Regions:
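Well-ordered beta-sheet/strand-loop patches within structured domains
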Residues: 1-127
Length: 128
């Protein structure tokens, strides 16, 4: 029998592993020479270089439609954090650095997630 990873022992151990990885990423970001975009402009820029539209709601087989409605909320909340962000030369855009953790306390709702080849629902789901 193959030895299990610590994160596979229980949901609690999985959570500890996730928190460890987040902490390591934050430490790497702190000491990294990468400069993340953080400056925001409230006024719209004078030119639109690229625009894109996608349908937000899709009826998926075997998926509760409420998860699609929640996705709209999650995208709106994340969009508010990204809106107006200026990426200057030499800077890097990081979705997760800009948006941060998607928690219920911040208003994020359960949305559709895909992990390990399975559909699920997690707070902040639907952003990818």
């Amino acid at each position: 029998m193959a030895r299990k990873l610590f994160c596979q022992l229980s949901p609690f151990c999985y959570r500890i592993s996730v928190e460890k990885e987040i902490m390591l990423r934050n430490l790497r970001d702190l000491i990294s020479p990468v400069r993340f975009a953080e400056h925001r402009e409230e006024e719209p820029l004078p030119a639109l270089i690229k625009g894109h539209r996608s349908p937000m709601l899709r009826q998926l087989a075997g998926v509760d439609m409420q998860l699609q409605y929640n996705k709209e909320t999650n995208l709106r909340l994340a969009g508010e954090r990204i809106h107006g962000l200026i990426i200057e030369p030499g800077q890097t855009f990081s979705f997760w650095h800009t948006v941060g953790r998607t928690t219920a306390r911040k208003g994020y709702l359960p949305g559709l997630t895909i992990g390990a080849g399975r559909l699920g629902a997690e707070t902040g789901g639907g952003l990818c």
